């Protein structure tokens, strides 16, 4: 325990660690605030002039105007009828034919509902959404019964021809059966905000990789490790203390910043929006059985597992590195490696490799969030595996394996010494 406290104190007292932790905390607040600036709203004042709002004011205005609560088939029908009435009034063929002031006054509150209805009733063979006048009141009453059919067509469009396609279809349908219906909706937390949670995860991983990289390598660089390895407690006990201290500091930083992001985001966008069904935010056929608020916490914990696996790899690399520069280079490359592999290596091999790398699931297009909301499957031996499930199932295995390799590597040095 004394070794652990001393190591904890040693790492925390370095100027670089303090600076990086401060940057991480600032990033959490900035990443929560930035999506707020993307929100806009326009309305007419008492004189008939257009008034535009952005940021927090726009959020509050939209929350006052837009539909919220449980989205029943009757509410869907009400939205369609409002749209079709205005379309007929202006002989419009698209939303661009509607005067802006009319759109914001009569239709904007219904826009999310109508967009999702068009997605649900898209052509099963082409994926093309129908025109506004192509939908009927009966369609709106059958909105929820249409969703499994839409899901089936999406899987067919994206996965047909792959060995194991039928299994992918079955997995998707089983997951979607667990989604609670009817959906709920309240304007607030946006898809952009959730994207920034993913970006924050990447940035925190990079910062913490920099913190963890010198934990073992700095002693090797200065020669202190040669002395430590010859002492009574310089073997497994010291290795365990260093590993525990590094995990404690980086883990606490990641969780603190993640919680700050969630609290600030929900405070800015409004806590009511945390009850919105994930399907209303991304796609009506998303497989996640969560509300937005639940997804925020699920993503924090899930990304934390992957983050922990990456830190374990960085520490393992630090054990074998002879100087800080080598350890830092390996650490940074390992964080971005899954993104590069995902973009450069084609086919099933590239998908599996980007998934199984230590930082698999952290990044941009390869990020866990997008694997959870999209229909990305991995195929092997005629079987289909939901990629998000593979990412989450493999993370604990990576952690145990990499921590074990780090300890084993340090013990080997002890024997050599």
Regions from the language model: what does each represent?
Residues 1-21:
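Aromatic- and glycine-rich beta-strand/loop motifs that create alpha-glucan
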Residues 26-76, 82, 139-219, 240-320, ...:
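Secretory targeting signals
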Residues 219-226:
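Hydrophobic transmembrane alpha-helix segments characteristic of membrane transport
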Residues 351-376:
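Short hydrophobic, aromatic-rich alpha-helical segments embedded in or entering the lipid bilayer
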């Amino acid at each position: 325990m004394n070794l652990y406290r001393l190591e904890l104190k040693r790492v925390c007292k370095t100027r670089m660690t303090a600076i990086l932790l401060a940057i991480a905390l600032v990033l959490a607040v900035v990443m929560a605030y930035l999506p707020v600036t993307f929100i806009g709203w326009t309305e007419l004042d008492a004189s008939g002039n257009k008034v535009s709002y952005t940021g927090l004011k726009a959020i509050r205005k939209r929350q006052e105007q837009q539909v919220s609560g449980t989205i029943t088939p009757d509410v869907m029908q009400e939205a369609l009828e409002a749209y079709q009435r205005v379309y007929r009034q202006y002989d419009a063929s698209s939303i661009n034919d509607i005067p802006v002031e009319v759109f914001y006054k009569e239709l904007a509150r219904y826009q999310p509902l109508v967009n999702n209805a068009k997605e649900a009733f898209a052509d099963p063979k082409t994926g093309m959404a129908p025109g506004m006048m192509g939908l009927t009141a009966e369609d709106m009453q059958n909105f929820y019964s249409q969703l499994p059919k839409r899901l089936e067509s999406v899987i067919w469009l994206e996965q047909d021809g792959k060995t194991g396609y039928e299994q992918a279809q079955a997995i998707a349908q089983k997951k979607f059966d667990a989604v609670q219906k009817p959906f709920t909706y309240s304007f607030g937390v946006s898809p952009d905000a959730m994207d920034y949670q993913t970006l924050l995860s990447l940035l925190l991983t990079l910062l913490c990789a920099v913190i963890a990289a010198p934990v073992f390598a700095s002693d090797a660089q200065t020669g202190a490790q040669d002395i430590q390895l010859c002492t009574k407690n310089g073997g497994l006990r010291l290795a365990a203390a260093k590993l525990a201290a590094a995990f404690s500091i980086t883990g606490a930083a990641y969780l603190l910043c993640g919680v700050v992001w969630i609290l600030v985001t929900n405070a800015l966008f409004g806590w009511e929006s945390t009850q919105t069904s994930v399907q209303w935010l991304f796609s009506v056929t998303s497989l996640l059985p969560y509300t937005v608020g639940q997804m925020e916490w699920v993503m924090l914990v899930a990304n934390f597992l992957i983050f922990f696996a990456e830190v374990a790899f960085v520490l393992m690399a630090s054990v074998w590195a002879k100087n800080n520069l080598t350890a830092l280079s390996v650490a940074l490359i390992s964080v971005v490696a899954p993104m590069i592999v995902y973009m450069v290596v084609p086919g099933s091999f590239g998908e599996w490799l980007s998934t199984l790398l230590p930082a698999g699931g952290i990044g941009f297009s390869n990020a866990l969030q997008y694997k959870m909301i999209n229909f990305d499957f991995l195929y092997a031996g005629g079987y289909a595996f939901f990629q998000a499930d593979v990412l989450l199932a493999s993370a604990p295995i990576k952690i145990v394996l990499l921590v074990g390799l780090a300890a084993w590597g340090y013990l080997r040095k002890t024997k050599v010494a």
